[in-house]
């Protein structure tokens, strides 16, 4: 079965390509390399000993999409492509809505014309806003979303639901991720944010290898056990395996699944686990809360276990261990010394 993976050179996309190839799927990737690097795909091939097909380009390029579908005839799409920085989305709402929404609409239009009606969408727990209750089940109402990035995830979910209502032949699976961290155990692929990392673990990783001085912990006065924000962290390899299960068990209609461990960890829990993984203290300082941050957000992943047979295998210590292994082997990410020169 041939799968088109949009944004397949990115962090979650590249790990999912590994799982797909290891499960004997044919993989075609389209990625504009805005947030990613082609080297990740070379390493996916090295890890798996298999080849994939890569098209560099944008979902906003309809001619390219038609060329891909003409040449490859994929049977299903896993859709990761999109701008993804919360802070940047507040500064650049027009770019975020145009890229993420218009790109998805063009993709779905070409899929429809080529009779490819199976899509797994990379959504996010951000659609729950400040959740009405925790742990969060899939029927938790969507909350107030405080940034354009989160709004695009919620809007794309609704677009895909509406497409499926209009044409029952569509199979739509919406995967709401919690907080993916970690890296492939080989240390060959991992998270490589450009510039100063926005997310907690890549930031800690840069501190651990001496690239950054110390971690800023935003708020220690939340209503949580140690006062710092609590999140559900999930190993990226577990998350990638969830996509393969979702693809394997696709059915007509719309299916929605939370992908998380069901376990909440505070910022300081993660700092402690990372210190253990790297064998050194992670210096940090407490800073004021960030606007829009919530106290606690963690999943109830029961539905994915019952319907997909999927369950996270890795705990926070393995997540931090694999993150540190990746960062130690690749202190400058995918960038080579020649590129830096």
Residue ranges and their predicted role:
Residues 38, 168, 179-199, 210-231:
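Short, flexible, glycine-rich and Lys/Arg-enriched loop motifs at helix boundaries
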Residues 112, 191-196, 292, 311:
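A general boundary/transition motif marking the beginning of the first structured unit of a protein
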Residues 57, 196-197, 263, 312:
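Residue-level signature of the cytosolic catalytic core of signaling kinases
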Residues 1-183:
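N-terminal Rossmann-like NAD(P)+-binding domain of SDR-like oxidoreductases, especially those catalyzing
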Residues 97, 146-154, 190, 194-198, ...:
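Short-chain dehydrogenase/reductase
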Residues 203-341:
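C-terminal substrate-binding subdomain of Rossmann-fold SDR/epimerase-dehydratase oxidoreductases
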Residues 40, 86, 132, 138, ...:
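Glycine-rich, flexible loop/turn motifs
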């Amino acid at each position: 079965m041939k799968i088109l993976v949009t944004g397949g050179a990115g962090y979650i996309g590249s790990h999912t390509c590994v799982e797909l190839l290891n499960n004997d799927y044919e993989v075609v990737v389209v990625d504009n390399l805005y947030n990613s690097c082609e080297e990740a795909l070379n390493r996916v091939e090295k890890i798996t000993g298999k080849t994939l097909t890569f098209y560099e380009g944008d979902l906003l390029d309809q001619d390219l999409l038609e060329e891909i579908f003409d040449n490859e005839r994929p049977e299903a799409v896993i859709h990761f492509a999109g701008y993804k920085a919360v802070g940047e989305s507040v500064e650049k709402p027009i770019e975020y809505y145009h890229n993420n929404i218009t790109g998805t609409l063009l993709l779905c239009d070409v899929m429809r014309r080529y009779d490819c009606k199976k899509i797994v969408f990379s959504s996010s727990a951000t659609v729950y806003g400040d959740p009405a209750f925790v742990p969060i089940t899939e029927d938790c109402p969507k909350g107030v979303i405080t940034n354009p990035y989160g709004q695009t995830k919620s809007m794309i979910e609704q677009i895909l639901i509406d497409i499926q209502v209009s044409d029952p032949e569509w199979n739509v699976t919406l995967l709401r991720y919690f907080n993916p961290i970690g890296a492939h155990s080989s240390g060959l692929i991992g998270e490589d944010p450009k510039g100063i990392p926005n997310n907690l673990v890549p930031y800690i990783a840069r501190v651990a290898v001496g690239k950054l001085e110390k971690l800023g912990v935003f708020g220690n006065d939340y209503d949580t056990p140690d006062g710092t924000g609590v999140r559900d962290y999930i190993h990226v390899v577990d998350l990638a395996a969830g996509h393969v299960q979702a693809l394997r068990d696709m059915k007509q209609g719309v299916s929605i699944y939370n992908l998380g461990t069901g376990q909440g960890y505070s910022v300081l829990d993660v700092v402690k686990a990372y210190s253990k993984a790297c064998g050194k203290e992670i210096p940090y300082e407490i800073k004021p809360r960030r606007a829009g941050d919530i106290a606690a957000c963690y999943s109830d992943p029961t539905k994915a276990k019952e319907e997909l047979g999927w369950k996270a295998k890795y705990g926070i210590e393995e997540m931090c261990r694999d993150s540190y292994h990746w960062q130690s082997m690749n202190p400058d990410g995918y960038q080579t010394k020649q590129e830096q020169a």
